Amino acid sequence: MRMLPTNQIWRYWSFETFLEDVSALGVRDVDLWLCNNHVNIDAHGAYNTDEVVRGMRRHGLRAMTLTPEQGNPKAYNVASEDGEIRRLTLCYYRQIVRLAAALGAERISLNSGWFPFDADRDRAWDAMVSMLGKICRAAAEEGLTVALETLVDKPYRLVTSLETLGAALLDVGESNLTVTIDTGTVARNGEDIDAYLSRFGSELGYVHLTNLSRDIFAHLAWGDQLGGLDPQDLLRRFACAGYAGDAALEMTKPSYFERPRDVLSRALTTLRGCEC
């Protein structure tokens, strides 16, 4: 399994520092989170594409995955019923597809969006399915896959379980739409990794290898003593299922923001100690 650090905990640092830190730790492949501090992109353009491409190449790095900013209160929402938000959302993802092509990325990592508590779930579901289909078709033009993850049920209430993830894949019906298993989210939702591996098999296109504490609503780093998941057991399960693809190391706990390089170094050391 290839581990892809993300720039999420570098959000208060420059993009150059992120590039320097991960390359110094021997990393070559990353999941690039599209925060505007690092990648200046919106529905109308990707304004620093050349700078991002040059920086990645200068440090010998590859962006294998692009992860948009998504979810409330972000501006773009794949489940919105509002016509103008839908137009801008699709334009945003078309810009991401162009950026992915410039970077030589393989996939876009998505979630199912959100809808207001006082809105109809079925209408939001239909809006989500329609938008995911459009995004998948745009991505297919550049040979990209789209990897869809589950979220926690509250407050998202759309794709939040094995069953709703399977329903989304079936309803969208695009061959380049694949499954992301987020280990921390699956555990937080009380589900079983093996059930996902058994259900989706060849449809598994990506992994978020995340740790968790049930008392902290964040993705914890491997090596954080508050984390409750066993990385060696998880890696064994994926290996037994034949998964040898990419795994993003998403870490979002705010206390990591001041020392992101140290947090990533500890996580990589922990995971390397679990390899067979």
Summary of predicted features, one role per range:
Residues 33-39, 77-81, 250-252:
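Glycine-/proline-rich flexible loop or hinge segments
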Residues 42-49, 82-86, 118-125, 158, ...:
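Flexible, glycine- and charge-enriched loops at secondary-structure boundaries
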Residues 1-7, 12-26, 53, 57, ...:
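Histidine-acidic metal/acid-base catalytic patches
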Residues 9-11, 34-36, 69-72, 112-116, ...:
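Active-site-proximal loop/turn and secondary-structure-junction residues that shape catalytic pockets
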Residues 33-55, 112, 116:
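Glycine-rich, proline-tolerant flexible connector loops at the mouths of alpha/beta enzymes
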Residues 52-75:
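Short hydrophobic interaction/assembly module
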Residues 32, 63-68, 105-112, 146-149, ...:
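Short beta-strand segments at enzyme active-site cores
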Residues 58, 75-178, 188:
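Active-site acidic/histidine proton-transfer and metal-coordination neighborhood
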